[in-house]
């Protein structure tokens, strides 16, 4: 039976000094016999998805203490991708994931904590904490801040979100008054942006991995029901500690819950709900922390057999996360996947002995439990606020229509092929990814002329200056993990292509990545990246490029001899942008770039290189 990790600093004569310091934090004699639960909060006033989290750590802490544990809260950083976007701030977004993972490891290991509650929400915070949890492999529960309500305005018949504001702002035909109205209406409350963007995608995937409570990904930040998730997280983590430290039950450890099959479940859900392509990057990174052999080839295999059962903004204007919740949330999607034979249901979770038990209890089409039905009727109030749990509005009915509703059955899927795909070819030997959920079927096969840009900034200038024409394939390179550095999101270029009326007439390929708000024929994560000698660095203006989603291929239409000749020429020049880029690459960013791998490896640190540098 394992000892509490915390005994290292709470027991024995030699730890008198440490105990003295623990006492200064409020601990008493009886507390040294209890598990110390680290509460990793990510409150910040910079990010709407985190602005309401200030008191959440203490809410969990009090419940931990009532359940018999000792709670100690600390904070991590949190970057808002939307605010950091469109300038050099975006260089810091993906590297912040590693900083978050490291900071959780540092705090938990330095103080010998026995377990963790991860209070996350937005784009890099949930992945960073997930990486840390799998690295540490001690009991953990994830609880997020919850999604934002969709925006409302008389100028639109559908709910609004951040992307709507960006697209309308770039539309030269839109009046200043209309732009201002969209801006004021798009993000009305606290919470992660209201569509199936990266933050909400990742919070949904923690449910599929078995590390979060049902409703974690879909219950609105503003709704009073969400408070119960925080309270239950406090009780659950103490129970997990009891099972592991007192009952010798290793099945509750995160690597045993989030095993290979659980990663398949998470990716299956991601494909079925048309999640952000960033989730692929983050799942690959988390799998490496868990020492699981899960890669793009596994994702490619799943993408060919999993149908799309849910469609949410930005892939469709009609639905946002509040509608997913009304339709039964993530466990109703998992239930449909299970009935289709597409899910591993024999796996443990933090709340149920098996995923099958969890589905039986929480899928609204399988349970008659009125409390569950009431929970999923929680809806938006339509009142701008930055306060959590501030409203108790409920829908009059659930959306249990599996033929035409927000969530569909396998038989009535939006499409029989899912919302994400992996493409391979001579331009991306190690793969690249596309969110097919946001691509019109008429352009699933697209051949066009390459239009080269060697930075996101120059691409934005070119698109706004009408240098990009119908039939072009915009290539934005040297924006990968090393080349950026930091693998910027390309939401502005894709949004501006839409605003120029080119959303269905152009494609975009990059070794950078995309916001979860991106739609259209936008292909990212090209691996190897240009800075690592990837063939995307060999494309020239006017080259023909063929994209074939049905056959999962993407190719530069030149022969092998020409490709080899170009590679030899580029080797002499060096793999760097031709044009000078006025961006300040600090020591912190250089350190990230030194060790960063390409996107097919999750853009994590190159551990083999690190082992050579520090044997």
Swiss-Prot record:
Q: Which residues carry this modification: N6-carboxylysine?
A: 124
Tell me, what is one Gene Ontology molecular-function annotation carried by this entry? Answer: dihydroxy-acid dehydratase activity
Q: What class of enzyme is it?
A: lyase
Stretch forming the signal peptide: none
Record keywords: NAD included?
no
Q: Which cofactor does it need?
A: [2Fe-2S] cluster; Mg(2+)
Q: In which pathway does it act?
A: Amino-acid biosynthesis; L-isoleucine biosynthesis; L-isoleucine from 2-oxobutanoate: step 3/4; Amino-acid biosynthesis; L-valine biosynthesis; L-valine from pyruvate: step 3/4
Its function, per the record, reads: Functions in the biosynthesis of branched-chain amino acids. Catalyzes the dehydration of (2R,3R)-2,3-dihydroxy-3-methylpentanoate (2,3-dihydroxy-3-methylvalerate) into 2-oxo-3-methylpentanoate (2-oxo-3-methylvalerate) and of (2R)-2,3-dihydroxy-3-methylbutanoate (2,3-dihydroxyisovalerate) into 2-oxo-3-methylbutanoate (2-oxoisovalerate), the penultimate precursor to L-isoleucine and L-valine, respectively.
Identification of the protein by name: Dihydroxy-acid dehydratase
Natural source organism? Pseudomonas syringae pv. tomato (strain ATCC BAA-871 / DC3000)
């Amino acid at each position: 039976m394992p000892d509490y990790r915390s005994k290292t600093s709470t027991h024995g004569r030699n730890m008198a000094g440490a105990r003295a310091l623990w006492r200064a934090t409020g601990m008493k004699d009886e507390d040294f016999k209890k598990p110390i639960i680290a509460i990793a909060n990510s409150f910040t006033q910079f990010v709407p998805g985190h602005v309401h989290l200030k008191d959440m750590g203490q809410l969990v802490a009090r419940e931990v203490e009532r359940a018999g544990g000792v709670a100690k809260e600390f904070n991590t950083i949190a970057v808002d991708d939307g605010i950091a976007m469109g300038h050099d701030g975006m260089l810091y977004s993906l590297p912040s994931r590693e900083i978050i993972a490291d900071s959780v490891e540092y705090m938990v290991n330095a103080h010998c904590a026995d377990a963790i509650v991860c209070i996350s929400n937005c784009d890099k915070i949930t992945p960073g904490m997930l990486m840390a949890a799998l690295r540490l492999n001690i009991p953990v529960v994830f609880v997020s801040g919850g999604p934002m309500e969709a925006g409302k305005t008389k100028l639109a018949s559908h709910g609004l979100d951040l992307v709507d504001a960006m697209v309308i702002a770039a539309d030269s035909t839109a009046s200043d008054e209309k732009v201002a109205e969209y801006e004021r209406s798009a993000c009305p409350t606290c919470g992660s942006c209201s569509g199936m963007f990266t933050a909400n995608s990742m919070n949904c995937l923690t449910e599929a991995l078995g590390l979060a409570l049902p409703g974690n990904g879909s219950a609105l930040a503003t709704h009073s029901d969400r408070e119960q998730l925080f309270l239950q997280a406090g009780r659950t983590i103490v129970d997990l500690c009891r099972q592991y430290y007192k009952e010798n039950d290793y099945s509750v450890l995160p690597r045993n819950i989030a095993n290979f099959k659980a990663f398949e479940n998470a990716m299956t859900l991601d494909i079925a709900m048309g999640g952000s392509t960033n989730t692929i990057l983050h799942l690959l990174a988390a799998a490496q922390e868990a020492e699981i052999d899960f890669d793009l080839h596994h994702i490619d295999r799943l993408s060919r057999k999993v149908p799309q059962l849910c469609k949410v903004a930005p892939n469709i204007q009609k639905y946002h996360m509040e509608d997913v919740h009304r339709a039964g949330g993530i466990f109703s999607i998992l239930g449909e996947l299970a009935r289709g034979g597409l899910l591993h249901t024999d796996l443990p979770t933090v709340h149920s002995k098996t995923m099958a038990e969890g589905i039986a209890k929480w899928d609204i089409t399988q349970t008659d439990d009125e409390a569950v039905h009431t929970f999923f009727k929680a809806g938006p109030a339509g009142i701008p606020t930055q306060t959590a749990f501030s409203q108790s509005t409920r829908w009059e009915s659930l959306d249990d229509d599996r033929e035409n509703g927000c969530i569909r059955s396998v038989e009535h899927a939006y499409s029989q092929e899912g919302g994400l795909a992996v493409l391979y070819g001579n331009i991306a030997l190690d793969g690249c990814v596309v969110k097919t959920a946001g691509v019109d079927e008429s352009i699933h096969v697209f051949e066009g002329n390459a239009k080269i840009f060697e930075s996101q900034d120059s691409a934005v200038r070119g698109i706004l200056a009408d240098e990009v024409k119908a039939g072009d394939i915009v290539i934005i390179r040297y924006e990968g993990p090393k080349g950026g550095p930091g693998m910027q999101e390309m939401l502005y270029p894709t949004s501006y292509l839409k605003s120029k009326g080119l959303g269905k007439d152009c494609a975009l390929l990059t070794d950078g990545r995309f916001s979860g708000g991106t739609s259209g024929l936008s292909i990212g994560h090209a691996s190897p990246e240009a800075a690592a000698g990837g063939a995307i660095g060999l494309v020239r203006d006017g080259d023909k490029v063929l994209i074939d989603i049905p056959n999962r291929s993407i190719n530069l239409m030149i022969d092998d001899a020409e490709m080899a000749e170009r590679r030899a020429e580029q080797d002499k020049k060096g793999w760097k942008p031709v044009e000078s880029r006025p961006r300040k690459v600090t020591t912190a960013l250089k350190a990230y770039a030194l060790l960063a791998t390409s996107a097919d490896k999750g853009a994590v640190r190159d551990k083999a290189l690190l082992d050579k540098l520090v044997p």
